[in-house]
């Protein structure tokens, strides 16, 4: 009994731990930007670290189950590398640099709704307006998009949750982003969420033909390293930007590479297999709350009223989508039970035909069932 309960708790603890991990990434990355870290270089180093860390595990544990590489699989891997390590990460970093850590983490709660819209476009999701849960998915998506629009168009007065001490974390360029930069950052975050959602959809297809999760993560990060290195050589002209040392930039690269591009990818794929994508996304608002507190405490960020109102709408919309989606998904065990119950009248009730069952064995006039 205790073992069964522990198995149910493990996915919950894993996803909650990831929310703390993501919140830490928001803060550490923002600190590195304030100290002059270039986001193209950071994305490159991040995926170098992730590749180096994950490759040994892929080689050790998936040597016998790793599928053969084909051209079709390679093109999918290349597309995954473009969508997440290159486009999503750099758009996200641009958004983070031009807004704030708490704002960015709040906006990413729109991810499930964007994924739902893309799933409708690609016919991976259906809507039946006669069903309450289908209507809830549509209404939740509209509410989430509305919350995102509020955060974009209405900034409102600043609200200081925690009075932060002025320590070394606040060094560097700590000025509040201007309105123009805020809009640019918001557009970048929207692009980041869209490419991230597309990444999840393509990843679900890829896992069906390439089910070795560790190897998949390693290959995606490896391709992401190459793509980001090429982009960095084009976009970054200052050689000193590549210098690394014992500073916040190195910490951001190592932390985000290990926790958010390596471990997180793997844990999410495992939890999605066990409990489904709805369960995985339902904990994302926790990251927003943790980041808002840490951002106020560590970075002296002020949360604006528009961000709070928009975040409330996003969370309400998110849970409406999550609830509706959960009604679409049937637990595999439940499916087996339903299937078995449907088979009982046909397969388990033995027909009597002159004292013989369907197979021809004598029944002695007795009807049996299993």
Swiss-Prot record:
Primary location group: membrane
PANTHER family with a match to the protein in the record: WAT1-RELATED PROTEIN
Family: Belongs to the drug/metabolite transporter (DMT) superfamily. Plant drug/metabolite exporter (P-DME) (TC 2.A.7.4) family.
SUPFAM superfamilies xrefs: Multidrug resistance efflux transporter EmrE
Membrane topology: Multi-pass membrane protein
Gene Ontology cellular component terms for the protein in this record: plasma membrane
Domain EamA, chain residue ranges per copy: 23-143, 195-322
Keywords: Membrane, Repeat, Transmembrane, Transmembrane helix
Pfam family, one: EamA
GO MF annotation, one: amino acid transmembrane transporter activity
Subcellular location: Membrane
Annotated transmembrane regions: 11-31, 41-61, 67-87, 102-122, 142-162, 182-202, 216-236, 252-272, 278-298, 303-323
GO biological process, one term: amino acid transport
Top-level taxon of the source organism: Eukaryota
Originating organism: Arabidopsis thaliana (Mouse-ear cress)
Protein name: WAT1-related protein At1g44800
